[in-house]
Regions:
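C-terminal motif of bacterial Sec signal peptides marking the signal peptidase cleavage site
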Residues: 16-18
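Beta-strand-rich domains and repeat architectures in extracellular enzymes and scaffolds
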Residues: 36-69, 84-96, 242-244
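Conserved beta-strand position repeated across blades of beta-propeller domains
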Residues: 51, 94-96, 133-135, 180, ...
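Surface loop/turn motifs at the tips and blade-to-blade linkers of beta-strand repeat domains
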Residues: 38-43, 84-88, 123-129, 164-171, ...
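A short helix->beta-strand "capping" segment at the edge of beta-propeller domains
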Residues: 25-44, 77-78
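Signature of short aromatic-glycine-proline-rich micro-motifs recurring in repeat-based ectodomains
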Residues: 47, 176, 223-233
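Bacterial signal peptide processing site
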Residues: 20-22
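Conserved beta-strand positions in repeat-built beta-propeller and related beta-rich domains
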Residues: 58-64, 102-109, 143-147, 188-192, ...
Length: 254
């Protein structure tokens, strides 16, 4: 065997390995929050959805049978600016804004409730399965249903367009709850989890795990009083809260 033949035999396996390898996924970032301040949350709020409106007020969607509501309030003064109560047959869930309108999910009723700016209900739409979290990418509404799947919904008709399976390091991220769309990412609460997950909604890949250990949760001892509620303020700043919490936490993600 010639020298060139021997060299080809040695190099060939390496070449095949190189050709068949796939690029490794980028590593998941591990971030945390810094608490910048607090504000009062309206009392008796089983928080299911939270968003900042164009006037820097907060929209709050709450749950529980017979107690669910949609409310606009000022985080600076704590004043309620508008409020509507859901019919007792609905358990309220996630909310999001689409122009001058607001959509609110219901848990098991398969109904999305549409409101005008003054929180007057103007329409309804139906969907299959449960409703948990909701946010607006600018093109689609992203909806969670407690699984590891994000559902892409039409912002006008609420018809389902497509779905994306969410994974963390290749494994399904189950129990996705409240959602907040920010730029090309979606920030998600996961039920019974003190982390927040930043997700690429096009691929479903979790790009960052954000610890909220800097928030003192020691007073919230009821198992149901979990972290739930993300509202983007600007840049890397957010309002965070939870179910039946008394406070909103103004945080910076870093």
């Amino acid at each position: 065997m010639s020298f060139l033949s021997r060299a080809a035999c040695i190099l060939l396996p390496c070449t095949l390995v190189a050709c068949s390898s796939t690029p490794a996924e980028p590593e998941v970032e591990h971030l945390s929050v810094e608490v910048l301040g607090t504000a009062s949350l309206p009392p008796n709020s089983f928080t299911q959805g939270l968003e900042t409106d164009p006037d820097s007020n907060l929209l709050l969607g709450t749950g529980q049978w017979g107690e669910s509501r949609l409310e606009r309030f000022s985080p600076e003064t704590g004043d309620t600016l508008a409020e509507t109560r859901l019919d007792n047959r609905y358990f309220g869930e996630g909310i999001t804004q689409t122009g001058d309108s607001i959509w609110q999910l219901t848990w098991k009723s398969g109904q999305a409730l549409k409101y005008d700016h003054d929180l007057r209900q103007v329409d309804t739409a139906t969907y299959s399965g449960e409703g948990w979290g909701l946010c607006n990418t600018g093109e689609d509404l992203l909806m969670s249903d407690g699984s590891a799947t994000l559902r892409h919904m039409d912002p006008e008709t609420f018809a389902e367009r497509s779905t994306t399976d969410v994974t963390l390091e290749g494994k399904p991220l189950e129990d996705i709850n409240e959602l907040e769309c920010v730029g090309e990412s979606v920030y998600a609460n996961v039920w019974m989890d003190d982390n927040i997950y930043r997700i690429d909604p096009s691929s479903g890949r979790v790009t960052a795990v954000i610890s909220t250990d800097a928030i003192d949760k020691s007073r919230y001892t009821n198992p149901d009083d979990v972290l739930n509620g993300i509202a983007h303020i600007k840049d890397d700043e957010f309002w965070l809260t939870g179910k039946r919490w008394e406070e909103l936490f103004h945080v910076r993600v870093r």
